Amino acid sequence: IACRGGYGAIRLLDKIDYDIIKNNPKIFCGYSDITALELMIYKRTGLVTYNAPMAYSDFGSDIDDFSTKSFFDTLQTGIKEITLNSSTVFYDGICSGVLWGGNLSTIQSLCGLDFLPEENFIFIAEDINEPVYKIDKMFTQLLNMPAFKNRLKGIVLGDFSGLDNEKYFQDFFKELSQELKIPTTTGLKFGHEKQKLTFPIGANAVLDTNLSKITFI
């Protein structure tokens, strides 16, 4: 379990012996800047990691019961589905792929590396204190990568804390989803807010916006 996020995880990526990790699999979990490690571990080893609360940032303070229960339930007994609460659906539909993503600005920083999954994927994204024009720019940069756009089958948005313009945010994803014509929705409880789910990155899943559910298969 990571202690905290912040910055600097990307500096570690070329210094890690991924064969050691692959041959000695362990639960690896965190969020925010830790996204860089999670996605590269999945890419280089095929091992599932977990978007989850962290030791100092969450368990070291006043963590809530919801986050604690989700953490231990998921890691001890597994998770079968996620209900997307209070979701805004920008484009209806059903899609499948590996659940993949995390902190948007951290993912953008990986561009130039071989980090994208080989499989079709459902992209999850969250961030904090990023103006909407930068969110627009980061998504656009990713979509300009043919491998990203071709394998992208759905988008699920988590918490984007500290937004400067909620209407622009909504308008951007409404327009984007109409252009891509893939299921796109909000409602995944992960990011930098107090309550957060624990769930696997790299697990096969089905997104059904009509049922507001992600089901792991």
Listing of model-derived features with the role each one plays in the protein:
Residues 46-108, 112:
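Conserved anion/nucleotide-ligand pocket segment
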Residues 4-7, 130, 160-161, 190:
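Short glycine-rich anion-binding loops that position phosphate/pyrophosphate groups of nucleotides
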Residues 1-24:
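N-terminal small/polar loop signature for handling phosphorylated ligands or for N-terminal nucleophile
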Residues 159-217:
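ATP/nucleoside-binding phosphotransfer catalytic cores, i.e., glycine-rich phosphate-binding loops
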Residues 33, 107, 155, 202-205:
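Buried hydrophobic positions in well-ordered alpha/beta secondary-structure cores of metabolic enzymes
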